[in-house]
Amino acid sequence: LNRPEVHTLSCGAAKPRDFDCHLEALDHYDNIAPTIKPIEQRLRAEMDSVLGADWCARWPEGLPHYVDVPDEVNISEILRLWTYSKSLDLVDWGQMRYNLLGQADHWFPGEHVAKLDVEKVADCLAASPFAERIPGILAEAHEILHAADQKRLSESDD
């Protein structure tokens, strides 16, 4: 909630007790900016160190909306998941999110890479400064993130 355009917090709570730590965090609400700034700086520095500052600053540039990609593969979301999974070791989180693709309708739209025809996608990546790298990154993302299809927490039995 450090950005003014963010007005909704999705915390993935499946049970009422899952809200406890979020409610406790409200005690620190007035200290958000000074608390978050050094944390964000360390995270961004680690991402830059692992993936390079150019990638971290520019990877979203020129990416098409998923409805403009053959077979509606959500390239921008897959690259976001790969970026955080690879640079911050958030693989478990990335797997959970990646495997929602194709399962969560409008809440998490688009398909994952299993449906991607690399030959068809080259034209829609042309505006990206990383157009040549992206097919390989998408393949790697699928390799490290694909597991069993997931359901949203609200639909799970746990």
What are these regions (language model features)?
Residues 1-158:
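Structured C-terminal cap/extension of enzyme domains
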